[in-house]
Swiss-Prot record:
Pfam families: Toxin_6 (PF05453). This is Potassium channel toxin alpha-KTx 8.1. Has the structural arrangement of an alpha-helix connected to a beta-sheet by disulfide bonds (CSalpha/beta). Disulfide bonds join C3-C19, C6-C24, C10-C26. GO terms for cellular component: extracellular region. Expressed by the venom gland. GO terms for molecular function: ion channel inhibitor activity; potassium channel regulator activity; toxin activity. It is found in: Secreted. It comes from Androctonus mauritanicus mauritanicus. Blocker for the small conductance calcium-activated potassium channels (KCa2).
Length: 29
């Protein structure tokens, strides 16, 4: 998942979107 789609991708998992080296990382809230 790209950074651009990260927020949408993570919100489905009730997680917070973070970007690491242009990769999507979801952090649990």
């Amino acid at each position: 998942v790209s950074c651009e789609d990260c927020p949408e991708h993570c919100s489905t998992q009730k997680a917070q979107a973070k970007c690491d080296n242009d990769k999507c990382v979801c952090e649990p809230i």
